[in-house]
């Protein structure tokens, strides 16, 4: 199909012809559509890579926010306030999915986000002490948003609780928000962390969590199995 053309005289005195509008012939439309899809795939991969680098698991890349408390947290977020969320629920209640969905919003908004289980965080910090290239305390203590998944699964020894306190106290003092997920209420978490006699550290940790966290109870329904646990 012939295209409308526009001519102009350049400084060289020669008439230059340019296409006035995109060709709407079938072949050109197909090329443009193919390019649009390619750019969409490229952007999707880029967004996925950002989430994976932040620690969001591939299984939860498509997680969506389902709770009004999560929506409020996202919409009213102020990095200098330090308020966070504490998702509690049984196995399979959707804690990790909900926390991942919230984390996604902040990754895409350009905030530094670190998502890790408490076990993985402690392993990474220990590896940094052993010279194995793991992430040190500062990575977790200084991120704009930290998501600690499955809190209460970690060992309750002196090193683990002292390290956990260092991370959380650093965030507490610098008004940096933390999102927690756990099978335990905050009081039950304190008792669990005290099980090996580290009562003082346990109390210091749960006191800070209680002060800055809105508790969101996701119930006990196991979504993975479709039955009550």
What are these regions (language model features)?
Residues 1-70, 226-229:
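A short, basic N-terminal segment
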Residues 13, 75-76, 135-137, 141, ...:
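Short, flexible, glycine/charge-rich loop motifs used to bind or transfer phosphoryl groups or to couple energy/partner
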């Amino acid at each position: 199909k012939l295209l409308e053309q526009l001519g102009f005289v350049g400084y060289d005195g020669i008439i230059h012809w340019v296409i006035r509008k995109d060709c709407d012939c079938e072949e050109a439309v197909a090329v443009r559509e193919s390019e649009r899809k390619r750019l969409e795939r490229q952007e999707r991969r880029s967004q996925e890579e950002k989430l994976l680098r932040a620690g969001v698991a591939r299984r939860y890349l498509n997680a969506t926010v389902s709770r009004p408390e999560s929506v409020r947290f996202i919409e009213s977020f102020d990095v200098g306030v330090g308020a966070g969320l504490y998702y509690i629920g049984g196995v399979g209640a959707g804690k990790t999915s909900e926390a991942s969905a919230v984390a996604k919003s902040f990754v895409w908004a350009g905030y530094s986000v670190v998502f890790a289980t408490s076990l993985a965080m402690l392993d990474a910090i220990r590896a940094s002490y052993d010279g194995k290239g793991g992430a040190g305390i500062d990575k977790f203590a200084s991120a704009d948003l930290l998501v600690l998944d499955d809190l209460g699964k970690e060992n309750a020894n002196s090193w683990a609780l002292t390290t956990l306190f260092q991370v959380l106290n650093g965030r507490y003092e610098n008004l940096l928000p933390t999102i927690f997920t756990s099978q335990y209420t905050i009081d039950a978490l304190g008792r669990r962390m005290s099980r090996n006699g580290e009562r003082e550290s346990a109390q210091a940790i749960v006191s800070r969590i209680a002060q800055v966290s809105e508790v969101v109870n996701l119930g006990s329904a196991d979504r993975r199995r479709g039955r009550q646990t």
